[in-house]
Each structure stands twice: as structure tokens, then as C-alpha cells.
Amino acid sequence: MAKPNRVDAKKGRADRTAPAKVRIEGRPAQAGRELAPAGARISRRASDLLRAGHVWVYASEIESLVLAEEGDPPALLPVADSRGLLMGTALYSPASQIALRMVAREALSEAAWLELIEQRLRRAIERRVGLILSPLKGQSDSCRLCFSEADELPGIIADKYSDLVILQLLTKGVSSNSVRDVCVRVFRDLLKPAAILERPDPRIRELEGLDAPSTEPLWPADANNSKSATQFHLNGLTFHYDAGAGQKTGAFLDQHANYAAAEKWASQMAPGGRALDVCTYQGGFALHLARVSKSVTGIDASRASLEVAERNLTANREQSQLGTRVQVDWIEADAFEILRDWSSAGEVFDTIVLDPPAFAKSKRAVEGALRGYKELNLRALKMLRPGGLLITCSCSHHVGWTQLEDAVRSAAADAGRRVRLLARRGAAPDHPVVLNLPETEYLKCLVLEVD
């Protein structure tokens, strides 16, 4: 058995002689007792957060590590508090700031962890079937199947687009063939997809120190007989998905309930009006608004996204899901520049949707993000007719509800407009929020009437 390598996380050095004082599974601490075969001792602050239901431990909160000298660091680590009491088992990510992600409140072997993945993944999928796929059958055939920590599976994200399942394995602790095999088995058993593909998030995998996985399909194994593109449906509308392109894992499934809500609000407040969808991506809000508006304009900086939006428009016209009388235009432009020009030129709309990408991917970026949100909302407010509808979104976790509302309030003051809050909305229920883990809440959507 390899000798333990005791690492002082704060000093960044290895001490192979100092004993590791820790209690394993609640037994009294004894000098020289090792974390077997490896383990982490964390600060009191981190321990308190875990006891309150959080599941993350940052690298700066690890007081010491005991790791085997030989081989790669293990995927699973026992975690003890500062007194040496076992708190459970975590996935270990040595290259990440989030070094530990708790997966159980007891000691856990790798075999037991794989069994737990299967149980939790099955439960997550069954929950989506009950919440979305069964109630919306015939209208929506796509949703997020697994949402990482929100489903007690840190680093595992899976989306269903009609007959395709797209998997992301984003942490070192789950980026293994054994985990892939479990996921594929569950997807095939419960969903019977035409294909299962892994499409990583390069930015997150880089933070985790992970190489890009194979681009070959996970199932079927023969790439020549595997499909990578399909049509899927949300709220009775048709969209295209291509696994070889697109942001995130493809489309923004987290907005699908807000798409329907936007259509409903516009039908009540601005039927037959003129609508604008800013940062339209592939036309999600725009196509829903087209069912109740006389004309819709979608703006995006990505030509590739707008080409897909046009394909989506064509498909819905061909399938009679959209009338031929509604005018839909796509404009490739920077949102800030075109809104500034249009608001100065006196353009007027009945409905405006703002759905920009995340402006704040870290706390340091929040101040600049708030300036961006204020500017977009200011320009939109100047272009809305009295009684018009503004739907403004933020997908930045680091920007809270109060900060977003303050930005809109400040924009309204500068524009000389009075805004009435009609609804606060978040992500669809397939992207659940865990109250013990605030990081699972990121999408914020305000529905406003503008006087």
C-alpha cells in the first residue's frame, strides 16, 4: 500500500512524516491514523456550510489532504471537519477552485457511487417526465434531464432534444468511462433515444483540467449509423438542433416556459402588435411572439444563429404552426449599437424582449454587467409605446434579483417611464433551484408593463 502523502493545503507543501489526526466514520481521532486511502480535512466555515445543506468546498477551505503518493488523485475523497469527524464523501477536482463537491453524507466506495449515479439519474429523468414530457406531450418533446448539483449529480448535465440525448461530464470526478456507461444505460432504458452524444463545455473542462472527450457518439457505437441533428418541439413550435453547433448543449431549454409566458402576455397586452426580440439566438422568443403579433424582428450578433432561426421559421410556416401574414425579420447586429440607433431614430414597438448572454461570469464582473443591463433596458424603454410590454432577462447568477430590478428602475428613471412589475419568473422546472445551494438559481426574468 502506498504511503500517505499529507499535503498542507494552505502552505502548499507535502509533509510525509506528520501524522494525520482524523476520525474515520465517527471513531475517535488517533495520532497516526490515516485517511484511508485518501481524504480531506476542511475548515470550520466550510463544515458549517455543508451542514446547512451546501455541497461545495473551495480549495482555500481545505486545511489538509492525505493522498496516495502513486497514481492520479482519486475521484472520490472522504471529507472530515476540522475536528476530524467524517462528514461524507466528495468528488475531488484538484485543478478547480471548487475542489470538493459532496455527493454523500457517508463513506462511499466507487462501486456504491456508480450505483448512486444510476439511482439519482433515473429519479431525475422520471421527475422531468412527470413535470414536462407527459403533461406537454404533443407540444414539447425536449427538456433538461439532469441539472448537475440540483439533481445531486455534480458535473453531470443532460438534455433531451426529441430523439437525441446530449450529455456533458464537466468535473474530474464524473469524467470517466464508468460514469459514461451508467448514463448511457439509463438513457437507453428510460428514453429509447436514436443517439446519445457527449458535447462538452470547453471553458468548464479547461477549469477542471480536463481534456476534450472523444467526438464519437456514446451510442450507437457506429458513428456512420448515428444521427447528430434533429427537429424538436417546444410549446407546439418546431426547432432545429445540430450537435455539431450551438451554444451550451444546443438550445436554451431553460427559457421554454418563459417563451410560452411571453406569448401569453403579448396576446393580452399587445395583440397584433410590433415585437422585438433582442439577442434572439435561434428565434426562441421571436417565433412564439410571431403567433400573436403582426410583425417580429429578431436581433443577434451571430449570423450562424440567425441562419438557424430562419430555418426554424421556415419549418413552422411549412407545418402551419405560423401564419404567412406575420412578417418576421432577422438582423445581424450588435444589440447595444442598434438599440442606441433605433431609440435615437424614434422606433416604436409594442413588445420588446431582452435576453442577453451572461454579462457577469464572476463577482468581479457584476459592476460592468449592471451597466450593460441598464443600457439595454434604457434603450428598450425609450422605444416602447405607452402600455407596452417589456420582458427583460438575466442569466448571470452573480447578478441578483434586487440588482437587476435596480438596473431596470434606474433605466426607467432616465427614460422618464413608469414600469409596473407583472411577474418575476425563473428557469423552467427542468432546471430546479435548490434553496440550500443558491448557485443553482441563475435565470431571472421580469415581465413589465411600461407607461
Task: Show which residues each predicted segment covers.
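Non-catalytic accessory regions of SAM-dependent methyltransferases
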Residues: 1-162
